Amino acid sequence: MGIRERLSGNEAVATAMKQINPDVVAAFPITPSTEIPQYFSTFVSNGAVDTEFVAVESEHSAMSACIGAQSAGARAMTATSANGLSLMWEMIYIASSLRLPIVMSLVNRAVSGPLNIHNDHSDAMGVRDARMDYAIFRK
């Protein structure tokens, strides 16, 4: 097998998640973050991690599952983007008020009507005051 020179951002996040080996990952696919749970689920199915992967019916449920897992003492992660984050807003404020250290990978995308997949920070700015402690933006 040849040397791989680079990873996409989503592959890099999934690889970092593999190294973390969280207890629970709950995610619902939304463009452009879909590849994160997709790549990570291959690590789960191949036995590279012993994470409980929860495929949920919505982003609201993804954050709810992370809140439940983290409240029980598990390390929980999720990934989302744009309108998916908007659907999580209610639960993000609950997670923040409970001071739960949930890791969420947010792949920035414009929040708007159908088919806007261009990059901006309107999704992150919508929840910036939720007191999720750290935000790292990378080009």
What are these regions (language model features)?
Residues 1-126:
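Thiamine diphosphate
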Residues 111, 130-133:
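Small/polar-residue-rich loop-to-helix segments that shape phosphate-bearing ligand pockets
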Residues 133-139:
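Flexible, glycine/proline-enriched loop segments at strand-loop-helix junctions
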